[in-house]
A protein has these predicted regions:
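Short alpha-helix boundary/capping motifs
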Residues: 38, 50, 69-73, 117-118, ...
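Acidic, PIN/NYN-like endoribonuclease modules and their adjacent C-terminal/linker elements
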Residues: 1, 34, 114-142
Length: 142
């Protein structure tokens, strides 16, 4: 299983710069999908409507594609957002945020990925990438 940060997931389901790269990198692979992904992806798509970058119909299509990929097993729903994972994220923040600039959601994504034993970690966020490398996540290069 691979872990995509939400920025990569948005690119996978909605055309943006680097969408094709993400699509190629994920062909045939199972992708972790947590409640954090669900929240952030939904919010990101709604923000696109607010910014006039997407229509309501496009958002509904993306959300349906997500449901379809969950049903088909391309996305694997894993609910590991719990107090133990939050404690891991707090530990990562205490150890690394002062040097990487990583924010709470960066540390939470990395903590979620770390607890799953993923085979690859993809992110478009420089702070999250720095943290992922420091903690030994299998970062996949572009």
């Amino acid at each position: 299983m691979i872990y995509l940060d939400t920025g990569c997931l948005v690119k996978l389901y909605y055309p943006e710069e680097d969408s094709e790269v993400i699509a190629i990198k994920t062909v045939g692979l199972q992708i972790v999908f947590t409640p954090l992904h669900n929240l952030e992806l939904t919010s990101a798509m709604r923000l696109k409507v607010f910014r006039k970058e997407a229509t309501e119909d496009q958002v509904l299509d993306v959300l349906q594609f997500i449901r379809d990929d969950l049903a088909a097993g391309k996305l694997i729903a894993i609910d590991n957002v719990n107090s133990a994972t939050i404690q891991v994220a707090i530990g990562l923040s205490n150890q690394h945020s002062a040097t990487t600039g990583s924010r709470s959601l960066d540390t939470l994504h990395c903590a979620l990925a770390q607890t799953l034993g993923i085979t690859a970690f993809l992110t478009t966020d420089a702070r999250q990438l720095a943290l992922a490398k420091l903690i030994g996540l299998p970062v996949q290069k572009w």
